[in-house]
Amino acid sequence: MGILDPYKGFGVTFGTMFKKPTTEQYPEEKKETAPRFHGRHQLNRHPDGLEKCVGCELCAWACPADAIYVEGADNTEAERYSPGERYGRVYQINYLRCILCGLCIEACPTRALTMSNDYELADDSRQDLIFTKEQLLAPLREGMEAPPHPMRLGSSETDYYTRDPDAPLPWQASGQEQVAGQAAELEAADVIARRTAGEHSRADEVPAHGAGSERPR
């Protein structure tokens, strides 16, 4: 042993004395997770409240830990839970088996299943770690209606997946849009009434080559 070896050991000790502690004061202070963190699963809804899950069971087939159980059923006109022909009547995830790998998310064809940032899954009951459909479903937001109910975003399943996601919903038109629509309807009705009465003004004419343009000479 060299004469400097003890000082080298103390150097490591003294160096750690000035480092900031890495201990998190959990659960009082929870660490913020990454945006794409693999946490508890969530079953998503369409903007009208219908479920995105169509009961195809692809997530269960893709699960390497056999942690997902799905039982599908047919929709009817009297009871509709999703826009498709079928919906997930029973949906369970066993978090005693789940390894949070995310393969079920990749297999889902309708983006019905996603992973949240909730990582607090510890429990002292094995039965409570088997999450049911009611526990996994996303909460109802403004404008949503709890199923079963008819389709409100279109007349077919295709309308739900081809609509512009940024477009306003049919029942969520803003006050300005409603006022503008009413003003346009009144203006159109006024023009029709004046034309019916035989009145005609320059303002009622529509230029052949666009508003404000002149006919080329």
Swiss-Prot record:
It comes from the Bacteria. InterPro entries: 4Fe4S_Fe-S-bd (IPR017896), 4Fe4S_Fe_S_CS (IPR017900), NADH_quinone_OxRdtase_chainI (IPR010226). [4Fe-4S] cluster 1 binds at C53, C56, C59, C108. Its cofactor is [4Fe-4S] cluster. One of its GO terms (molecular function) is 4 iron, 4 sulfur cluster binding. It is a peripheral membrane protein. Keywords: 4Fe-4S, Cell membrane, Iron, Iron-sulfur, Membrane, Metal-binding, NAD, Quinone, Repeat, Translocase, Ubiquinone. It catalyses: a quinone + NADH + 5 H(+)(in) = a quinol + NAD(+) + 4 H(+)(out). It is an enzyme of class 7 (translocase). One of its GO terms (biological process) is aerobic respiration. SUPFAM superfamilies: 4Fe-4S ferredoxins. Its main location: membrane. The keyword Repeat applies. PANTHER family: NADH DEHYDROGENASE [UBIQUINONE] IRON-SULFUR PROTEIN 8, MITOCHONDRIAL, NADH DEHYDROGENASE UBIQUINONE IRON-SULFUR PROTEIN 8, MITOCHONDRIAL. HAMAP family: NDH1_NuoI. NDH-1 is composed of 14 different subunits. Subunits NuoA, H, J, K, L, M, N constitute the membrane sector of the complex. NCBIfam families: NuoI, PRK05888.1-3. This is NADH-quinone oxidoreductase subunit I. It comes from Frankia casuarinae (strain DSM 45818 / CECT 9043 / HFP020203 / CcI3).
